[in-house]
Amino acid sequence: MKALILVGGYGTRLRPLTLSVPKPLVDFCNKPILLHQVEALVKAGVTHVILAVSYMSDMLEKEMKEQEKRLGIRISMSHEKEPLGTAGPLALARELLTENSEPFFVLNSDVICDFPFEDMVRFHKHHGKEGTIVVTKVEEPSKYGVVVYETESGQIQRFVEKPQVFVSNKINSGLYIFSPAVLDRIQLRPTSIEKEIFPAMAQEGQLYAMELQGFWMDIGQPKDFLTGMCMYLQSVRQKHPEWLHAGPGFIGNVLVDPTAKIGQNCSIGPNVTIGPGVTVEDGVRIKRCTVMKGSRLHSHSWLESSIVGWSSSVGQWVRMENVTVLGEDVIVNDELYLNGANVLPHKCISESVPEPRIIM
């Protein structure tokens, strides 16, 4: 089977991290976002992954060529010369997608969830129509476009954009499986699959919804990235508790790379990921944070709901909170307070940031 992953966006909502790497290569729980998706696809029997690329495509190509060998699959690049929306990339990759007549997966690159790829194949083959959308239940459907479908069969009746009165609490999760016939509906131009292709398919009875059972999060912005991290760690707790770090000073779900060094008298967790080569000095307190490869947290620093980008340094007695995000190679001097700061790569912070703002 094949899968097309839409990785062409600029990732502006996840800046400053996406100023250093394209969004699919940002580390999520110690592994690039894209790799979580690709490994789940491979596990479900996918042998050919096509990446619809544009922004920083060289970096993506280099990283994924290394993974291609490790995973024993074929990875192809489909280069967009102009942004093609969410449907145009399917037309661009048409030749690759129609090398055989099997159905194929399509994924948005921001999605982290309990990927239900095997179930999707079974469900899609059972109804035998052109398309299947995975839907997920949300608390506040008014913020999204919702999907209205027959609960028994899953046949989609209509879509309602940001409803003000309750019609459904199921939304499009950004995971699809299509039969090749769907490609006859899509032209090679900027096109929205959600607004231009899906409504026509639903009207013709060719589109079905399958409900996701596990967790789901669109991690395209820092606040949601951290929420998604908490959900992912809880899922790890249920499925692979042996991956999590335990011992004195560790609280709840904590993922620590084996190459990280942790000092004495630290309090780490709940919901923390610590990447490769990270050094955490004595007396550090971390909760609900991700600390990326090669960073250093100096003694007695205190971090909550923050993201520390690659190779950054947080000084002694620093306090960081409220979705503070440090880009790559940021230095925060000793004894400062950062509240909701968004710090661009290669900056040195020498004064406190008491109110949320971007540090250029």
UniProtKB/Swiss-Prot annotation:
**Keyword ATP-binding found:** no
Among the GO molecular function terms of this UniProt record, one is:
mannose-1-phosphate guanylyltransferase (GTP) activity
Q: Which reaction does it catalyse?
A: alpha-D-mannose 1-phosphate + GTP + H(+) = GDP-alpha-D-mannose + diphosphate
GO cellular component terms, alphabetically, are: cytoplasm
Q: Name one GO biological process term.
A: protein glycosylation
Annotated signal sequence is none
EC class? transferase
Query: What SUPFAM superfamilies does the database record attribute to this sequence?
Result: Nucleotide-diphospho-sugar transferases
* Superkingdom of origin organism: Eukaryota
EC number(s): the record gives 2.7.7.13
What pathway does this protein act in? Nucleotide-sugar biosynthesis; GDP-alpha-D-mannose biosynthesis; GDP-alpha-D-mannose from alpha-D-mannose 1-phosphate (GTP route): step 1/1
Keywords noted in UniProt: GTP-binding, Nucleotide-binding, Nucleotidyltransferase, Transferase
PANTHER family per record: SUGAR-1-PHOSPHATE GUANYL TRANSFERASE
Family according to the record = Belongs to the transferase hexapeptide repeat family.
According to UniProt, the name of this protein is Mannose-1-phosphate guanyltransferase beta-A
Q: Which organism is it from?
A: Xenopus laevis
